[in-house]
Amino acid sequence: MKKWAIGFAVLGGFVGANAVTWNPVCETNGHTLVLSSDHFEICRKAKYDDGSTNNVGVSRDEAQKGLDILESVFVFYHDSLQWMLPQPGDPDNKLKVAVYVFDDEKMGALYGGDNTEACNEAGCSPGIWLGKGSLSDRSGLAHEYAHGMQSLTGWMGNNSHTGWVCESHANWMMHQFIPNEAPGCSEYLIDFPFLYYGSTRDRYCNWHFMEHLKEEFGGGIEGVKEVNRIWTESIKDGEAGRMEQTPFSAMMMVYDWTLDSLNQQFGKFAMKQATLEYTPAKKKLYKKAWGDYEFSTRRSVGVGYPYSNHARITMMNKIPCPDQAPGEGVEEECPDQYITPSYWAPQRWGYNLVRIYPDKAGKVTVKFRGIVQDKPTVKGYTCFGDNEDDYLGKKYKWCNYAPDALPDPASGWTVGLVAEGSDGTPRYSEMKHGKGFNLEIETKDNDKALWLAVTATPTEMQTIMWDQFYYSIYRYPYMIEVVNGTPEGYNKDFWKPANTSGYKQHSNGGGWVSNKASVASTVFVGPNAVVNGGTLTGKARIEDFAVVDGGTVSGNAVLRGRAFMSAGSVSDDAVLEEDAWLVSGSISGNAKVGALSVIFESTIKDDAEVYGVMWPLEYKTISGTAQLRGDLENNFSKEISKGIFYGMVDDGMLNNANYGANLTTPPTEATASLDLARWYAVADDSTDLDSSTTAIGLLQQVRPMGTSEPKLYFDKKEQAVFIRYKKNGREFRYRVTGRKN
């Protein structure tokens, strides 16, 4: 795949740190100087912002430790990386960076940003504010000083567009400073890769794409310098266009990229994520820090945040065969085709990894069909936002939560296959961009895994704002068909217990039931369902690929889809469905839990519903008619009994109509329903006939709906003549002559 050729420019405005005079700030502004170094001052203000007295005591050793860390950060950021110095407008005289120290009880965290008191103007000097315990926090100081430097560029734009990148980039800079550590939350992007890139939900933890760009630009110090150009060479404070600037438009401007160039980079990034294909040292570090993609890992406590690994790899849903049309000859089965669950489909520049299990070594072909959405489902929503700007005489009010207008979806995907060799080295297929196409790759008997990497790459820029509600953001679902392979979950005996000793097939449904479980004869256990433990009574139903490891299921409760139950209880008429997981707690009444929800020590009852795609719901009670949906960040402590909430939810939102407190039905989603999705032919189909097949008449490209003209062909392997045609977007073939094996 093509590597982007980018010239390495020396950053404008950089002057060696030792060539200038660094002047004090702390005592000049009436504060108490604790200790000073070449470029920093540990400073104690007399009062907190609330007017109370700041009595913090800082020993010389504590202050010196903080200064030593900060000076090492300074040398790395400025001397090694040549990031611009503070007060970029004055190359000869600089101000020391003030580090304001407070008592830990009043300020337990660290903050970095613009210190306007240093030079009586914004964008002049960085500052750091912290509790004294943070003076020894190496990673925290590196992160906050990066914020201080970002402030000198005007934060790249307004918070609605760029707030997330400030946190992401600061953690990435911290990672450059401490390269043998992966910042603590960095597995979040691995856990929830389908969220749009730049999501507010994982803003501290989604810096992986910057590491990818660093390596695209040659790696090492030069690669870091190239990434930092988006801060130093993008539209500056005071220049026209800054309010509309996003980190992505900045990249396109600085690197002279088109949207297609950016889309290709995100496609390459997703393929790289399949094997974490960074430099050898980073690959080893990341695999140790983030764990693997195995199904057993995803259904365990996992790594990082507990029970958050289960959504890493997308599992497809099989498309039911349509009603077969009458015709002469022997009717053949319809092709095995699969569709993404809507909740698992990637948002803009999010990606899915789908594991493919080859039937045998050799060529595997994946037929990819994006589900094209031509227009929004709604024109927009009632504008709701909390960010405003006044810039160059113009006032900006951002609808950052609920946009009042939606762009066209501009459906597009960038897709590739990655075969992971026996030694972990990847082999890549061609990477394709568009709506529908076929991909192929050669596999080997000793390959570790085969991955399909699907990135949502719309053909028009999609700008998503800070905390924008989940329902207003497009997802980009798709369908696949695999030749010589099967998506995970549909390969032979995937759900069957590895050792059926101690199991029997249940009399009511035929599913596998362990002798460690107690299952009443009135309970239905479907043929693909498994009960490894627990007590199941009444008219409960365990359907599809649902698995019960423990707990109690009673009444008319239903588990279906790929629902997983470790413990707890599901009772009455409650439903656990789709890819939801009950780790512990209870679901009762008419409650429903689905999508990618994880329930841990929580109570879901009455008519409540939880359909989340992100964080586990822990120690919560959801009752009445309340609903939680989408990219949940559950920061509330009170019981919720009404309303429908998305995204970050805290106690202050529970009675606020703007956040959903008065909703009784979910808002219309921007993403169209999958009900009308139909398979369709593409130009690649005419070149994908098996070598044992001789074409007599090739299928023409057909509309997604309707029936194509029948064509005859002779299959050498089958020694038979078939009629092939398309109906309702699906392919059918009928045997006219020859043997039937």
Q: How would you label these PLM feature ranges?
A:
Residues 237-494:
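Beta/coil-rich, acidic/histidine-enriched accessory regions frequently appended to metallopeptidases
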Residues 487-552, 562, 566-567:
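Extended, small-residue-rich solenoid/repeat segments and analogous flexible loops
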Residues 1-18:
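Gram-negative bacterial Sec-dependent N-terminal signal peptides
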Residues 713, 717-737:
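Short, surface-exposed terminal/edge motifs of secreted or surface/virion proteins that either
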Residues 556, 562-564, 575, 579, ...:
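Predominantly polar beta-repeat domains that present long G/T/S/D/N-rich surfaces used to bind, process
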Residues 116-121, 135-140, 155-218, 228-273, ...:
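Acidic/His/Gly-enriched intrinsically disordered linker/tail segments
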